[in-house]
Curated annotation (Swiss-Prot):
Gene name in the database record: ccmE
Membrane topology according to the record: Single-pass type II membrane protein
Periplasmic domain ranges by topology: 30-173
Protein name: Cytochrome c-type biogenesis protein CcmE
Entry keyword set: Cell inner membrane, Cell membrane, Cytochrome c-type biogenesis, Heme, Iron, Membrane, Metal-binding, Signal-anchor, Transmembrane, Transmembrane helix
Amino acid sequence: MNPRRKSRFKLVIFVVLGIAIASGLMLYALRQNIDLFYTPSEVIQGKDNNPNQKPEVGQRIRVGGMVVEGTVVRDPKSLKVRFDLNDIGPAITVEYEGILPDLFREGQGIVAQGVLTQSAVLSATEVLAKHDENYVPPELGEKMQKVHKPMGIKAADLKGESERDRQEKEGAK
C-alpha cells in the first residue's frame, strides 16, 4: 500500500469509527426517553401472550386502558392517587402523585406514563385523559381492534355510547 492510499484508508476508518461512536452515544442518551406502549393485559401476560415480551421492572412504559370503577383511592393528606387500569383482561395498579386531568374519572380511558415498580404496579409520572367520549389513543385503538375482532365485536359497536349509557340517559329523563 502506498503512503497516500494508507492515509486515506486511515481517514475513512476514523470517520466510520467516529460516526459509530457518536451514534452509539446518542442512542444510549435517548434510551431513557423511549417509552413503549402496552395495554394492561400485555404488561401482565406479555405482547401476543408471550411472557418473554413482558416489560421489565424498572422499565419506562406507557399503559393505556380504562380506569376500573370503584378502585380510585385518594390520599386525603396529599395528591397521591391509586387506581386500577384494565382493558378486557387483567388489571394493573397505577400510583400517581399530582393533579389529575379534569376529564379523569372512573370508567374512562387514560394513558399513564411511568416506571414499572412491580410486575403489575406502575408508578406514573404523567396521566393523560382522553379528549372526549369518542377519543381513543391510536395505539390503544389498534390494540383493541385486534382483541375485539376475534370476539365478534364490530368497530361500530366500539364508537359512541354503550347500551348502558343509553339506559342511564333514558332513566334520567
